[in-house]
Regions:
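DNA replication initiation on ssDNA origins
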Residues: 1-71, 79-89
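Helical (often loop-to-helix) elements that flank the catalytic cores of nucleotide-handling enzymes
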Residues: 82-95, 115-119
Length: 119
């Protein structure tokens, strides 16, 4: 887990929470939508662990106390998933040798990650 904390390191004095207990359904997309909120508690290694095991759904603030970022992510969620062409994005990343790591999201979209060696 230390490797995960190292690459997803950012602001450690607060983090985002996606609370699924009172989730609503988005009428436009039909997708479940959690109650998003911000908590001003320490983002501890245990919180990371709870996220990785699925106990909590949290989000790290990528910028640290100095406003520097070590990672970033672009979240691509198309309006219509049926005709979503992931291959276009994958080929574009390869064609231009972009330093992005594409991961399919739970919804079927894409998350494009960018990592820096240091702040």
């Amino acid at each position: 887990m230390n490797g995960y904390v190292k690459i997803f390191n950012g602001y450690r004095h607060a983090y985002g929470i996606a609370d699924w207990t009172n989730a609503t359904v988005d009428p436009e997309s039909g997708k479940k939508k959690p109650d998003y909120r911000w908590t001003y508690e320490e983002f501890t290694d245990q919180i990371y662990q709870d996220h990785l095991t699925g106990e909590k759904s949290v989000g790290a603030q990528p910028t640290n106390e100095n406003g520097d970022a070590k990672f970033g992510v672009i979240d691509i969620d198309p309006k219509e998933y049926e005709g979503f062409n992931k291959q276009f994005y994958l080929e574009t990343i390869q064609k231009y040798d972009l330093p992005l790591i594409p991961i399919e999201s739970k919804s079927g979209g894409l998350h494009l990650y960018l990592f820096m060696a240091e702040f």
